[in-house]
Amino acid sequence: MKKQPKMTAIALILSGISGLAYGHGYVSAVENGVAEGRVTLCKFAANGTGEKNTHCGAIQYEPQSVEGPDGFPVTGPRDGKIASAESALAAALDEQTADRWVKRPIQAGPQTFEWTFTANHVTKDWKYYITKPNWNPNQPLSRDAFDLNPFCVVEGNMVQPPKRVNHECIVPEREGYQVILAVWDVGDTAASFYNVIDVKFDGNGPVLPDWNPAGQIIPSMDLSIGDTVYTRVFDNEGENPAYRTELKIDSETLTKANQWSYALATKINQTQKQQRAGQLNGDQFVPVYGTNPIYLKEGSGLKSVEIGYQIEAPQPEYSLTVSGLAKEYEIGEQPIQLDLTLEAQGEMSAELTVYNHHQKPLASWSQAMTDGELKSVTLELSEAKAGHHMLVSRIKDRDGNLQDQQTLDFMLVEPQTPPTPGDYDFVFPNGLKEYVAGTKVLASDGAIYQCKPWPYSGYCQQWTSNATQYQPGTGSHWEMAWDKH
């Protein structure tokens, strides 16, 4: 009896600070969205089918961070760098072929596009562009590939949107594989966020109505000679081993992820009557050296397919605990120092880098760590300017392969002179019902905030212990109600 292997467990535990996220947003399909963005599918599985993009690089850990110069199409990212917005973190997104990325079904006409924000910046607008009917999907994305007249424009009115928004747009007529470019132009920086969305126009219904998508073969990792990859096919009663397809890795060629994905899809098509694998091409299922969707025959009684592995040499587990980071540091005469403690599980290389909001590195540290090792690390920042900063932690194995990456946010703040009672009207939330435009309150962060003029002044009174979004300085939407003094 074959056992389900224990796959690599990668954990990065960051303690001592809540994970406040300052950047920024991505195209999603959690509630109403018609399709997820390319970068979204690097981290999250597609709604309904479970498909994912692979080999995305470091951006898979930060899908909200595809940020680049604004002004598209006059300025903005260079041709060939549109998908990544010229961000080194997202460079893998610029790869472009007809079969490189998961494609989400779409139809022309009214459609809903959804954004999820980790930081809901004041917004100028959102614009949506689509590739031309005759674009070449095997060339890097350029301005020439797109119709540069946006098919949908949504005004942001220079206010903060909620953490999830829906845009109703009319999608133009197209056929086959197309790319939609969604651009979020934030109003409080000189940057925009760029998300490309890979879609496939399938007319008014599925190309092959007798086949239903039920899973996919994701080439997520290389294997070793002696390993086995196989399908796990489920019906209403659970897993049915009679429909399993196994592929033994018996050559060096088959150890490569794209190779075994292609070989397994080919074997499914050769041996299974109720299953097919590969990219749809007309009325054919064509295996590819990449992600291969799996389909089940209508009426077969089969429900879904997953991929299992029998790993001869279990992969090691890694975890890193980073503690000691404060929420904010006050700027003084001496350089800012971050005093951190690291604890490793597994043999690894740990890397820490501090960036300011503009991605300028201010401090770095890296060192090999052994299993169970505790280490104290002090990072001294090369400069200290008030605002948002990030501590980026990376785990690499002994071969230099990135295993995980996380970003933790903190603030540098100017020293404040303690306010006197004459500087404010109330200590928040005392006197809540008396707050009007111009009212000044002392907030929990020690700063003074003034209630905005009408029509925003009504938000100043909207607070309870269970609804704190407008709480000055700390609420998710406090800037809609208050000005900081």
Swiss-Prot record:
Residue intervals of the Chitin-binding type-3 domain: 437-478
Residues annotated as signal peptide: 1-23
Gene Ontology CC entries for this record: extracellular region
GO molecular function, one term: chitin binding
Pfam family, one: LPMO_10
InterPro entries: Cellulose/chitin-bd_N (IPR004302), GbpA_2 (IPR041029), GbpA_D3 (IPR054063), GlcNAc-bd_A (IPR020879), GlcNAc_Chitin_IntDeg (IPR051024), Ig_E-set (IPR014756)
Entry's localization field: Secreted
Top-rank taxon: Bacteria
SS bonds (residue pairs): none
Family: Belongs to the GbpA family.
Function as written in the Swiss-Prot or TrEMBL entry: Probably interacts with GlcNAc residues. May promote attachment to both epithelial cell surfaces and chitin.
The name this protein goes by in its record: GlcNAc-binding protein A
